[in-house]
Amino acid sequence: MGKVIGIDLGTTNSAMAYYDGKDAKIIANKEGRNTTPSVVAFTDKGEVLVGEPAKRQAITNPERTIYSVKRIMGMMCNEPKAQEAKKHVQYKIVDKNGACAVEVDGKVYTPQEISAKILMKLKKDAEEFFGEEVTEAVITVPAYFNDSQRKATQEAGKIAGLNVLRIINEPTAAALAYGLDKKGEEKILVYDLGGGTFDVTVLEIGDGTFQVLATDGNAFLGGDDFDNRIVDWLISEFKAETGIDLSQDKMALQRLKDAAEQAKKELSTKEETEINLPFITADASGPKHLVKKLTRAKFEAMIDDLLQETLRHIDTALEDAGLSKDEIDEIVMVGGSTRIPKVQELVSNYFNGKKLNKSVNPDEVVALGAAIQAGVLKGDVKDVLLLDVTPLSLGIETLGGVMTKIIEKGTTIPVKKSQVFSTAEDNQTAVTIHVLQGEAELAKDNKSLGQFNLEGIPPAPRGVPQIEVTFDIDANGVLNVSAKDKTSGKEQKITITGSSTLSEEEIERMVREAEEANRKEKARIEAIKARNELDAVAYQAEKFINDNKDKLGDVSALEAKIKEAKELIEQQSEDKAKIEALKNEINTELQNVAQNMAQQQQAQGGAQQQNQNKGGDDDVIDAEVE
């Protein structure tokens, strides 16, 4: 087995790590940074930018720059959270067969495809680091991700050319990185507040065993929401002062978002920050500038309701774990948003002033934990047992639109459970199994994961047929469902319909497209290198001509090729063969010109010597010596 990397595929930033046999270590990206912005951009020239280069050009290219796509991963477009996401991005979120997707220049991309581009960037950078191909990974997801979101993450990995060995919950990964070397038993609470999601997980750890006791959270609460509060405030303030509404100006909105994110970060170390955006817009009276001061106290007031919600999730997690606040030994803070002083203050106060454990790097610890899990799967990490749980209950819709739970929230995974149901009507020969995830009593209030039909049931009075429904959750937290008529032996496994997951055919197509895009990108980079080499050769040839004007004969052929080279470079030609052929022609022509010049100089030198010799003979006087 080759190298396996651990990947934290984050909402705002992603990170990767590996286990070297002793420790988990972060892999820096090509740009030398330990984290990579989870941003993908499409330029007007057809290039795809990922990471820092994509983030840098977002202001001038807002509609083609995709960020925070994790928020719509595995989500149906009619979900309220999807509608909320649409309001806060400058790119276009569209409906693709009911599921959320993004549209750029008329082409529709699924969140899996966008995420795959981020994963491909990480994969490529890891390969450069190791000097060998990387084909396997452990990828993290928020603990509160549902089945559709987990499957979508697996699909993204597959499109990127990665065999995803395991999907692991982010707080659990953080606990692995925190507790790998801990010898005694501890009950810990991981408070994970990232860019887009919030999870709280209670674990019991000791002697290599990591047992999740309970988990809770909100897959739509994080730093993005804090940024959005600042943006909304800036729009409101600017409108009150100038009468101009910036909410429809995509370029202005992107500038506001970037400024809001920066202000949020500055307020973690400063009491006040100034947001200064010159030329944010213009009207008949001329350009308008936005200059606002934001205090830490004002920012904290803006986001207080969101922070209070995180405390309610701690309540639920502790209740589900059957523990009191005083029984928690350590509170491990994870995720970039835990740097906000108010977050730390609220969590510490919740636990009666208990000191928070900030020994781990909140941006890197999840990737490190994923790398440790990769080490466990490879056999490099011994004596580690990880027992995670399902974050939400799973069941089916039964008579009266009620959800009947088959696997309860907090059940240790992997797990397989069955329950026997029957028909609702006489002589019913088919049943529809509607699979649900959530805690609500009514089916309509839960997340629909899909449905399938079991047909061929022998006619019988209602209540007589025995239909066994089996739910099987694997170690990734991914669900498989089957239904079997015990009388006829007919069995049917779930085929999700109207879901956000992709079919095998779609995944294979996307894999091919990703490989083709990768091939084109390699060809583009090779063409750039070839153009640079051509530019250098053309420059040297032109310099040679300019430096030796008086000594050269006819150089029109060389000058014509230099001109052709400049045109190819100006056009940014990607015809590598043509570029290299022209480079060779210029080199050959330059050698010929240089050779001709040398021969000419040699000939001139010989003629001068002959003239000198002739002149010497004329001066000789013949005389006899006496």
UniProtKB/Swiss-Prot annotation:
Residues 595-626 are annotated as: Disordered. InterPro entries: ATPase_NBD, Chaperone_DnaK, Heat_shock_70_CS, HSP70_peptide-bd_sf, Hsp_70_fam. Residues 595-614 have a biased composition (Low complexity). Gene3D superfamilies: 3.30.420.40, Actin, Chain A, domain 4 (3.90.640.10), Substrate Binding Domain Of DNAk, Chain A, domain 1 (2.60.34.10). CDD domains: ASKHA_NBD_HSP70_DnaK-like (cd10234). The keyword Transmembrane helix does not apply. The keyword Membrane does not apply. Induction: By stress conditions e.g. heat shock. Keywords: ATP-binding, Chaperone, Nucleotide-binding, Phosphoprotein, Stress response. Pfam families: HSP70. The modification Phosphothreonine is found at T197. One of its GO terms (molecular function) is ATP-dependent protein folding chaperone. HAMAP family: DnaK. Belongs to the heat shock protein 70 family. Acts as a chaperone. This is Chaperone protein DnaK. The lineage of its organism: Bacteria, Pseudomonadati, Campylobacterota, Epsilonproteobacteria, Nautiliales. The gene is dnaK.
